[in-house]
Amino acid sequence: MTEKQFPVHCWLSRMWDTEAQIEQKIGYRDKLNSWGVGQYDAEHVSSRTGENTSETKYLEYTVLSEEIEKKITEYLYQNRRTEAVIGNVTNNLYRNILFDWYINHKKWNELCRTYNYGKSQLYSIRQKALDAVARSSRKVKQRKTTSSFR
């Protein structure tokens, strides 16, 4: 599995665990199709032949980002990360995966040309992910506060 096919694995393994641990915890090899990653790759290739519209590609990208976001959040909760880690490291993690990887590796111009949308829409996707992290962090803090009164 290459970084181009699934960048999240590369980032996660660098930040936390070995490749085997990531495979075990997230199970990405078994879930590629359910995440839409395999479909995304295939349709991205077919889009060069003109079979897909830019709207379809934009939707694929958005759905893929949301699925990655969801799986990483699940990973953090399953491993019972502390509230500080979920609040701080997760923000950096999403920034790396959902923003910097696409921007720095695929470059702004290529992204805008491929998906036919501008920088403001890419920033919007990034902000949506970061907002989700903030909501997750607040939920964890509320749970900790509630349990301390029991």
What do these predicted ranges mean?
Residues 110-115:
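Short alpha-helical "recognition helix" segments of helix-turn-helix
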Residues 89-106:
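Short amphipathic alpha helix immediately N-terminal
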Residues 88-89, 116:
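Short, conserved sequence motifs enriched in acidic/basic residues, glycine, and aromatics
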Residues 78-81, 92-94, 125:
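N-terminal positioning helix adjacent to the helix-turn-helix/winged-helix DNA-binding module
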Residues 1-88, 135-150:
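N-terminal interaction/assembly modules
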